Amino acid sequence: MKLTVILLTAVLAASASPAPVDVDARAPVALDSRSPIDIDSRSADALANRAAPPQSEIDQWLKAHNNERAQHGAVALVWNQTLSDKAADWASQCIWEHSNSGQNLAAWFSPQANKPMNISQGVGGWNAEEPDYNTTTYSGAGHWTQVVWKSTTSVGCAAYSCPPGTLGRKPTDPWKTLWYYVCNYYRPGNVSPRDKYYPINVQP
């Protein structure tokens, strides 16, 4: 029997202490002046020496996002290598929690070893939340609303194959393949007040 598990989590823009919970379980924060995600001194050297993902992989990330955005009146995102470097740095730590605001996470587990990366699994899971979006409360689909958020203009993503026993799993769990998908966005979406910013940024 084939068994796989996908976990998804999103974080609000400018959250003071991000946590690996669904964005809609938390109150949005106020929109403020933001700049692209900073690279801290701890990881600056590592990021400077990190190779960019191959263009074929970048194209997959952008296609998965922009096909969905095109259906909801949002312009196509462009690739942001700074955000991608930061995503790769975080993904490689295999920690199931957020590193910053304006970020979507997904994890895919399989009991079969050496399963290949599949970007559409991560982004596809976020996009699949669309039917859960509540246009009255502007809640229920935090990952999807970040994907289609109109004010967001660029994205940088990374995928990393984590060892068993990471990403919140136990070493005794059956998962032999653990893929971690991380995307960072600028400008971050999911900001408040909801009734002001969601109607102009999320087109169902």
From Swiss-Prot:
It comes from Schizophyllum commune. One of its GO terms (cellular component) is extracellular region. Residues 1-16 form the signal peptide. Keywords: Fruiting body, Glycoprotein, Secreted, Signal. Residues 62-185 form the SCP domain. It is found in: Secreted. The gene is SC7. This is Fruiting body protein SC7. PANTHER family: CYSTEINE-RICH SECRETORY PROTEIN-RELATED (PTHR10334). SMART domains: SCP (SM00198). The keyword Transcription regulation does not apply. Glycans are attached at residues 80, 118, 134. Its main location: secreted. Belongs to the CRISP family. It comes from the Eukaryota. Pfam families: CAP.
